[in-house]
Amino acid sequence: VNLIWFVWGMVLLVSQGYLPLNPDGNIGQTCHQAFNTCISFMVNCNLQHYSGESGLTYFTQLFVIMLFQFITAATGMAAMAGIMNALSKKTTKTIGNFWDYLVLSSTRILLPLSLVVGCILITQGTPMGFDGKMEVTTLEGVEQTISQGPTAAVVPIKQLGTNGGGYFGVNSSHPLENPTYLSNM
């Protein structure tokens, strides 16, 4: 199954320049970079050799990175559930159904918590939209480009699944990923 997800991620990352939800015109990753991104997010080490807001499109943030972060967190939870199930019995020949544990941990724990945390982040000012970069004038009168996007959708699973790989290049240090004290908790 992971091979299918890996191929899915590779195809989308390499061709992201032609996919929808790309208002900033980001180009596709090279094969080497897409390979590194897919492998690192599939095994939950989340090594980033790109800046999230400029190296990925909104589409690939949602349908590759966020998907992989759900899968890896649920995989770890399912493995732990199987181990706990086996340890709770005096003798056993099986440790349970991995697929069942995977689906339950995704749909009963990770998804509901991510939705709640995402709603909290939106109320605190974390961006959640599909508009392109904003051009603003600073107090000094200088033009600045501010990245936006579906940040409030990606950050919760990153935090719940103990994944790295932030939406912005500096991860949770970015003021839009962590705008208030409450969102920092």
Predicted features along the sequence, with ranges:
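A generic, lipid-embedded transmembrane alpha helix
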Residues: V1-V11, N36-C45
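Short gly/ser-rich anion-binding loops that grip negatively charged ligand groups
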Residues: N2, G28, Q69-A73
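Hydrophobic alpha-helical membrane-insertion segments
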Residues: N2-I27, I109-G129, V142-Q144
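P-loop potassium selectivity filter motif centered on the GYG triad
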Residues: P20-Q61, M128-M185
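A conserved hydrophobic secondary-structure block that centers on an alpha-helix together
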Residues: L56-F130, H174, Y181-M185
